[in-house]
């Protein structure tokens, strides 16, 4: 391994003498009739023939400039509302080019002002990228990037997550480069809106797919923040500190140092107000996920995520991946991060970040659960829990792009994450059968866990002299390791008509889990004839996962003084090996606005499962699948396009799903894995239509996606009608549940999303309307009978955001969500519930520096538990005064939860139960805060 690293380093640095020819390009946009400067015009330079695009806006003087433009043939395009667009094709020699005045012809008469102004272009469509003009959305002086994107059509910011075009934003780039790794929250909450020129929304593809142009469907929704030209040589940021009642405090800041391509940012934060300007990385599954991923046997996650049927969350976001947003409960946060970006010797583009955060969470929950059972008796439970957790996260990300020459480049992406978590919890659960208390369980649990992820992607791409002929190879490696221990004590009481029964359990567990993966992918593209090309692909993956979970039962008889005994039922030593070969061929067509590709691949999988304890076996399975994929994009014109994608893929069960080790963290809800699980096959079809009318400043977006899964991995649940012996020494009390994953057909899903946005000059505001309809059918087995949980979710959202001035900013919004849930097995548990949230956000700067900010929200709930207040009013109010030069300093007093009605409500729906969850939240407090904004330009 060390020898290979040395070879790679020698290869990298031996190429330092090879330089690409790059230069600068500038010009000025002016009106043809009066030669007046045109500000905020959109200027794009597009490479010919591969259509790579770089875009910026003209300054107040009408001027624009592009740095580091490579030698080649380009098309320049300039657009602005009220003018005819212009286009020119030119050759660039890689040195410097001044294009002089570029004249735009007005489509209507203009005023006689020195500078031509007006409502800026709201958005424009550039292939698969939607670009918003930041100057078209007025925000106050201290607004963040998150405040800016809230105003943009189709963008929704809620519960710490940003969604656009119906998908969650996974990454935010700054001028095309990562900021704080893969954490979108860090960029949006910490970067000031005034530094932003454009925001681009697109589906980011892998480095290999972007190089070859072959869309493989493995995309993530990404925002690219294009900074203003005058902010690229500046230092800016802010620092703040505050203290309030109940010993509440808040301190932090971010400072950015920009000098051309060299950029450095440092951010820090400390508070006990549940403020978190970043997303935590959850390697252990302890910060909100219900799966308990990576936890020792008996481990109890501190919270729950939604089941497959859908959910509503208040006070926390859905947890579906390692990056999670704010946690419910009372959270104390300390965080520090740095981000670095620069070009080295013209050939190297380097970006790196390090982030550290520490959180302490005091969480209390009340969970009302209704079970989906086909039995004469109704069954429900109430759980009351208290937990304390102490969590540390470190993460390091780096990206190095080496432009060897005009035909070759290399990208290296190393990543390292580390997490540790110490937690304790006390849980009391009562089970009621026909409204009579049947049993009660009290569990005292504590754990200490550590997790580490290390990965690296190495990509190399080569373009041959023949147009369209390319070759690429990518090597991806990863290693993960989780370890820890836990201790659990449970007291179980069961109530009968003639007598009561009680039992206790004391145990401790150890976890040692690790795995690695090596993936190599080769792609070669050959042009066949005009507009057609063929691509050949081969991929090889080797993955090994090992999980040792050992649980020891304490001896409860102090007189015998026996040592703890290893439990074979609660322990397992398991290993899973996967070898994958994929060979595929794609045919692509690209001409006159139509791009299409058809791919067929053959995937061979060999899965070997090895158990060493408590049973010894070695089992090997092989799977072979023909997998089609189709992609099409058609541009009707420069303002509208249609995109369609179909894919068939297979996924194999994880080691956690395969390993048959009993989890008895709750004696009333036991679970285990299933060694007999097979692969699952999924079909996905997605269609998306986008239209942007620059002249009318309106935008329309529509998306619909269908999903179908064969051999879907679901749950097989057994509910005991009477005390049942599952394993030797393991008793499932009456009303208890035992769950195991199974393969089952019949999973179907549909997602749809509509968005319309328009600038309304009459009220000088942007109006955004969005709607969505989601549908899912999730099959499962309950007491040997098939149940299909069907969920329909309808959501409507309307937002009016002001565009009046930088002193007055208001947003009026309302969101209505209607949810229908049906179960084929138990019709009596069919339910529908309605949630509506309406809010008014106001930020007003008046009399030269006085500030009032108000955020009022009404929440209405119908169809949830009777214990939940159907009407909740939340109001945060603050007053402040700006002072010092350019009003850079501010002193503000804030009243949080003026009406004392803050809450945290969650509805979780799974295949076998429905939960209504209430969590503790911050109560009313007052805070005095001082903020100073740093601004130093033209360094």
Question: Residue spans of the language-model regions?
Answer:
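Short, ordered, surface-exposed loop/turn motifs in non-cytosolic proteins
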Residues: 33-47, 123-125
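Conserved C-terminal beta-signal and adjacent last beta-strands/turns
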Residues: 797-801, 805-815, 830-939
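A short, solvent-exposed loop/turn motif at the edges and junctions
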Residues: 48-51, 73-89
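Signature of Gram-negative outer-membrane beta-barrel scaffolds
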Residues: 533-637, 828-830
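Membrane-proximal, glycine/serine-rich, low-complexity loop/turn segments characteristic
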Residues: 21, 63, 77, 84, ...
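Outer-membrane beta-barrel translocator domains and adjoining extracellular loop/strand segments
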Residues: 212-213, 278-283, 363-379, 388, ...
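Outer membrane beta-barrel strand-and-loop segments of large Gram-negative receptors
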Residues: 384, 517-519, 564-572, 678, ...
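Short, acidic Ser/Thr/Gly-rich low-complexity loop/linker segments typical of extracellular
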Residues: 48-63
């Amino acid at each position: 391994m060390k020898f290979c690293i040395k070879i790679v380093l020698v290869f990298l640095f031996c190429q330092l003498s090879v330089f690409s020819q790059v230069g600068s390009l500038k010009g000025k946009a002016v009106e043809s009739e009066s030669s007046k400067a045109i500000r905020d015009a959109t200027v794009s330079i597009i490479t010919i023939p591969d259509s790579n695009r770089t875009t910026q806006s003209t300054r107040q003087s009408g001027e624009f400039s592009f740095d580091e433009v490579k030698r080649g043939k380009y098309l320049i395009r300039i657009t602005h509302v009220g003018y005819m667009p212009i286009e020119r094709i030119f050759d660039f020699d890689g040195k410097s080019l001044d294009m002089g005045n570029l004249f735009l012809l007005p489509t209507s008469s203009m005023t006689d002002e020195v500078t031509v102004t007006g409502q800026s272009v709201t958005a424009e469509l550039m292939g698969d990228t939607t670009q918003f003009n930041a100057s078209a959305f007025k925000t106050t002086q201290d607004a963040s990037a998150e405040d800016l994107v809230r105003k943009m059509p189709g963008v929704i910011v809620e519960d710490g997550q940003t969604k656009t075009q119906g998908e969650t934003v996974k990454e935010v780039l700054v001028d095309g480069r990562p900021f704080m790794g893969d954490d979108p929250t860090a960029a949006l909450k910490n970067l000031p809106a005034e530094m932003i020129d454009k925001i681009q929304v697109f589906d980011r593809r892998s480095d290999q797919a972007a190089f070859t142009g072959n869309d493989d469907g493995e995309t993530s929704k990404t925002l690219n923040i294009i900074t203003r030209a005058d902010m690229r040589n500046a230092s800016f940021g802010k620092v703040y500190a505050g203290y309030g009642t109940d010993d509440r405090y808040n301190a932090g800041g971010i400072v950015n140092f920009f000098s051309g391509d060299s950029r450095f940012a440092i951010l820090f934060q400390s508070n006990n107000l549940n403020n978190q300007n970043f997303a935590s990385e959850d390697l252990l599954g302890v910060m909100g996920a219900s799966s308990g991923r990576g936890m020792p046997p008996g481990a109890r996650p501190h919270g729950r995520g939604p089941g497959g049927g859908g959910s509503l969350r208040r006070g926390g976001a859905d947890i579906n991946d390692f990056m999670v947003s704010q946690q419910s409960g009372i959270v104390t946060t300390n965080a520090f991060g740095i981000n670095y970006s620069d070009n080295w010797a013209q050939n190297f583009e380097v970006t790196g970040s390090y982030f550290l955060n520490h959180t302490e969470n005091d969480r209390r929950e009340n969970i009302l659960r209704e079970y989906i059972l086909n039995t004469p008796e109704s069954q429900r439970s109430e759980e009351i829990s208290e937990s304390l957790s102490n969590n540390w996260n470190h993460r390091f990300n780096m990206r190095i792009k080496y432009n060897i020459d005009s035909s070759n480049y290399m990208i290296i992406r190393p990543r390292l994450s580390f997490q540790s978590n110490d937690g304790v919890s006390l849980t009391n659960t009562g089970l009621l059968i026909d409204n009579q208390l049947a049993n009660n369980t009290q569990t005292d649990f504590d754990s200490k866990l550590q997790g580490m992820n290390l990965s690296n992607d190495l990509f190399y791409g080569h373009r041959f002299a023949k147009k369209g002929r390319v070759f690429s190879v990518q090597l991806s490696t990863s290693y993960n390791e989780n370890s820890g221990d836990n201790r659990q004590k449970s007291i179980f009481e069961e109530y009968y008509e003639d007598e009561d029964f009680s039992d206790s359990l004391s145990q401790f567990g150890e976890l040692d889990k690790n795995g690695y993966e090596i993936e190599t992918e080769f792609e070669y593209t050959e042009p066949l004839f005009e507009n057609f090309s063929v691509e050949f692909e081969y991929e090889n993956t080797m993955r090994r996962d090992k999980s040792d979970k050992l649980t020891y039962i304490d001896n409860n008889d102090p007189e015998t003084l026996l040592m703890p005994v290893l439990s074979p039922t609660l322990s397992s030593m398991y290993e899973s090996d996967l070898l994958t070969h994929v060979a595929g061929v794609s045919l692509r067509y690209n001409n006159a606005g139509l791009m299409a590709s058809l791919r067929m691949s053959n995937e061979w999988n060999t899965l070997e499962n090895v158990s060493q304890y408590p049973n010894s076996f070695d089992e090997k399975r092989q799977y072979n699948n023909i997998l089609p994929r189709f992609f099409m994009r058609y541009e009707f014109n420069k303002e509208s396009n249609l995109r369609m994608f179909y894919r068939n893929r297979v996924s194999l069960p994880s080691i956690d799903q395969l390993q048959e080790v009993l989890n008895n963290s709750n004696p009333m809800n036991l679970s285990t894995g299933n060694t007999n699980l097979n692969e699952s096959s999924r079909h996905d079809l997605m269609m998306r239509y986008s239209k942007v009318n620059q002249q009318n400043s309106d935008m329309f977006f529509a998306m619909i996606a269908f999903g179908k899964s064969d051999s879907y991995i679901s749950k097989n649940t057994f509910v005991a009608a009477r005390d049942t012996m599952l394993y030797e020494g393991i008793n499932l009390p009456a009303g208890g549940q035992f769950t195991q994953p199974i393969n089952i057909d019949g999973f179907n899903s549909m997602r749809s999303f509509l968005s319309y946005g328009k600038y309304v000059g009459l009220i000088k505001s942007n109006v955004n309307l969005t709607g969505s309809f989601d549908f899912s059918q999730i099959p499962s087995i309950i007491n040997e009978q098939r149940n299909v949980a069907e969920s329909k979710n309808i959501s409507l959202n309307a937002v009016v955001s002001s565009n009046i001035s930088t002193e007055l900013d208001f947003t009026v919004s309302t969101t209505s969500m209607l949810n229908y849930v049906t179960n084929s097995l138990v019709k009596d548990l069919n339910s529908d519930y309605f949630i509506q949230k309406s809010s008014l956000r106001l930020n007003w700067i008046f009399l030269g520096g006085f500030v009032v900010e108000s955020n009022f929200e009404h929440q209405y709930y119908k169809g949830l538990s009777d214990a939940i207040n159907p009407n909740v009013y939340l109001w945060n109010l603050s007053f402040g005064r700006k002072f010092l030069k350019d009003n850079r300093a501010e002193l503000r007093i804030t009243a949080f939860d003026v009406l004392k009605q803050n809450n945290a409500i969650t509805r979780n729906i799974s295949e076998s139960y429905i939960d209504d969850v209430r969590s503790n939240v911050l109560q009313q407090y007052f805070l005095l805060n001082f903020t100073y904004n740093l601004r130093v330009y033209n360094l």
